[in-house]
């Protein structure tokens, strides 16, 4: 039996779930929502590529995803999709997850998107079809300032996926820190919002304790460069 997301009486009719990629934008969105006076997320929802057992696009192992959710103190809903997933299959799987417990109780899904209007419109339209709404706590924020705010808040992350068409593969496996920001080419968004890179957050104020992990091998797959992150301890 699942635990109702709003069982503590806090949320009333504003139960939230957070779309969680394991990266810096979703972690910062969680931090922002928890710091606000309004409702904060009661669950995380993540797409996992079943063929690989990893977070879709980011390539992070399932075990590390579970450790993030545990450290964040939130239940995790994994939506499994196949490799090379079509949009129709993705929408069917996601729609099913949103209609079932515990996400059926969530009226609002929060996202860490920053400025891509077409992505926002897509999310809002798809959620409206199932009677839910979207919220974007970081929307419109300056990405240069946001990247530095992330570091200043005490978050620690590593680049786990790089698009070699937009950023040199040598950035895969590097820590997301001031030195990395200084080294990024001028045409690369400091938050990677255009898909230049993705991150894995292993420490920060949204976690009860850091996630013990270390960087492993770097591989190229499906046109992207992935840095494997392994559990430690």
Region roles according to the model:
Residues 2-233:
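Nucleotide-activated chemistry modules centered on ATP-dependent adenylation/adenylyltransferase
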């Amino acid at each position: 039996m699942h635990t109702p997301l709003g069982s503590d009486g806090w949320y009333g009719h504003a139960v939230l779930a957070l779309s969680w990629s394991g990266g810096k934008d979703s972690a910062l969105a969680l931090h922002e929502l928890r710091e606000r006076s309004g409702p904060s997320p009661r669950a995380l929802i993540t797409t996992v590529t079943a063929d690989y057992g990893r977070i879709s696009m980011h390539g992070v192992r399932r075990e590390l995803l579970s450790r993030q959710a545990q450290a964040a103190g939130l239940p995790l809903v994994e939506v499994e999709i196949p490799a090379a997933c079509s949009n129709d299959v993705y929408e069917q799987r996601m729609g099913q997850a949103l209609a079932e417990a515990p996400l059926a109780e969530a009226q609002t899904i929060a996202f860490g998107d920053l400025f891509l209007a077409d992505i926002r419109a897509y999310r809002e339209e798809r959620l409206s079809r199932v009677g839910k709404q979207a919220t974007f706590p970081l929307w419109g924020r300056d990405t240069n300032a946001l990247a530095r705010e992330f570091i200043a808040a005490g978050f620690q992350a590593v680049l786990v996926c790089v698009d070699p068409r937009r950023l040199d593969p040598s950035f895969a496996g590097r820590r997301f820190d001031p030195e990395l920001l200084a080294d990024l080419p001028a045409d690369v968004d400091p938050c990677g919002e255009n898909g230049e890179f993705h991150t894995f957050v292993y420490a920060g104020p949204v976690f009860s304790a850091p996630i013990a992990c270390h960087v492993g091998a770097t591989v190229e797959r499906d046109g992207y460069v992935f840095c494997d992150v392994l559990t430690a301890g």
